[in-house]
Every structure is written in C-alpha cells, then in structure tokens.
Amino acid sequence: MRAKLLGIVLTTPIAISSFASTETLSFTPDNINADISLGTLSGKTKERVYLAEEGGRKVSQLDWKFNNAAIIKGAINWDLMPQISIGAAGWTTLGSRGGNMVDQDWMDSSNPGTWTDESRHPDTQLNYANEFDLNIKGWLLNEPNYRLGLMAGYQESRYSFTARGGSYIYSSEEGFRDDIGSFPNGERAIGYKQRFKMPYIGLTGSYRYEDFELGGTFKYSGWVEASDNDEHYDPGKRITYRSKVKDQNYYSVSVNAGYYVTPNAKVYVEGTWNRVTNKKGNTSLYDHNDNTSDYSKNGAGIENYNFITTAGLKYTF
C-alpha cells in the first residue's frame, strides 16, 4: 500500500501540470538556472534510548548541538517544459565546527523524572554534514512575474559528531549523584552519525515586482527513514549502538528574497528551517569487550532540527 501511495505522490506534479493549461507543451532546453551560496548551519540532533520492559519509558538521551557551521550550497533547475521543471540541489559543510553534547540517563524507575547520570562534553565537533535533493515541479501557475507549483522529490542528509573529554556526575549503586569526575582532555568519548533518507512532497512559488523577487518552499514527508551509529570509546565500556526508525515526519520551510542586478543575475538571501520529529524505532548493540550483542524493538528514538541561512547568486542561462 505504501509503495502505491508513494508512486501516486511522485507522479502528482506531472499529472496536475498536464491539466493545468490547455496550451501545447513545448520543449525549452535553453531555460536553465543555477545558483551558488555561502552560509551557516545551526541546530540540534537527539538520540534517545527506551526500555520496553519498563513500559517504554525513556532512560537515556544525548543532545548534540552545533552552531554557525560554514556551508556551501548549490542548485540547478531546468524548465524542461513550461509546466514541468526538474532540479538538483545540495549543501555541505566546509569543515568541522565546534559544538556541545550533553548525555543524561534516568535509571531510577521509582523516580523517572529525575536524571541519575549526566556527562557534559564541551569539546564536541560537528565533523561534517551534507545533503542532496532531487526533485520535479509541476507548475499550476507560470507567468513572467509569478509562479506556483507542486513538487515531489527525494532527499538525503548526513551528520557526524565526535565528543571528547568532558565531565560527569554519576550515581553509584549505593548513592545518588555521588560519583563526580572528568574525562582526560582530548580523549574520544562518543562518536555519533545520523542519516536521513526521504521522499517528499511540497509547494513552491515566487513573486517578482520590478527587480525584487520573493520566494518560498514548503516540504513534507511522512516516509522518513532514519538511521544512526553510536560508538562509545570508553575502554571499559566499548559498545556500538545502531538504530533504525521508519516513517518519521519531516517538515521544511524556506523563504528567500532577491534583487536582479542584471536581467539574468539575482543576488539573494535565504533562510531554511528543517525538522525531523522524534519516533521510536529498533536498536541493536554490540559489546566489543565480551563479544555479545542485543536487540531491542522500539528501543531508540532519533530527532533532528536545524536552521540554514545563506546569501548567494542565481543566474539564468
């Protein structure tokens, strides 16, 4: 059923565009535009652990935060026909960026609202992040000064982090928050990677007045497939956790404003907000010290939200 639904979603722009105008479709291979921009990426990504044997309550959460990572972003769009456009876009970080990670556990089932263990890692790096997007648009309105259309596409994004050093407050079996200390500076504590794969649908449009232009895009997916990999490097607790979550929700809103410095060239600024909401999924672990493994259904949660700001140049050939 989901495969049939997805097929309908992906063909929607083509079907609508074929009925949106009574004019004959014409092939316009020369109508291509490309843009390039520089900007920053900020946000937070979260991983959660749940215990099914305790009613699925949350027992652990790691928050990975990053701010103002430099990125380069680009896109190319081809108006294949007046009613149909295809495009490709993507961005990548230009280098690693400092961040912060907080790891909290709630191990006391009799007091589930109070954390028992916490570690803080201000020496955290966003190693890299990137994204690519392939899409097709069907234009319901396509006039020289305004456009409005439906879109569908496929998008993937990746994030990688490493936390080093830091401090901790743990609870022993006999006490509560009674074990306080720090990790060696520069020593790897945890490495974490997230990946999101999603087909999506959306709405996009723009409006031009003289040399000024405003545009916006909304995207939604209910078919996100998220996966992650968590490496605990502590020699006494060398464990790899892997999780997979299906059918998460994704929302994205993008707004841009630009000015045409020539008939074909536009400078612009843009802001984009993205969010993948939390949902439970399956997780597995492998203990490297004693060579044992375990699997838990609905034992993990994955979440991500970020904000991108860019400034760039768009040129129509």
Curated annotation (Swiss-Prot):
Transmembrane segments: 32-41, 70-78, 84-92, 131-140, 146-156, 198-209, 212-221, 251-261, 265-274, 307-316
Catalytic activities: Has a virtual requirement for Arg in the P1 position and a slightly less stringent preference for this residue in the P1' position, which can also contain Lys, Gly or Val
Top-rank EC class of the record's enzyme: hydrolase
Pfam families referenced in this protein's UniProt entry, alphabetically: Omptin
GO molecular function: aspartic-type endopeptidase activity
Localization in the cell: Cell outer membrane
Periplasmic side: 21-31, 79-83, 141-145, 210-211, 262-264, 317
Segments in the Extracellular topological domain: 42-69, 93-130, 157-197, 222-250, 275-306
Protein name: Protease 7
Native source organism of the sequence: Escherichia coli O157:H7
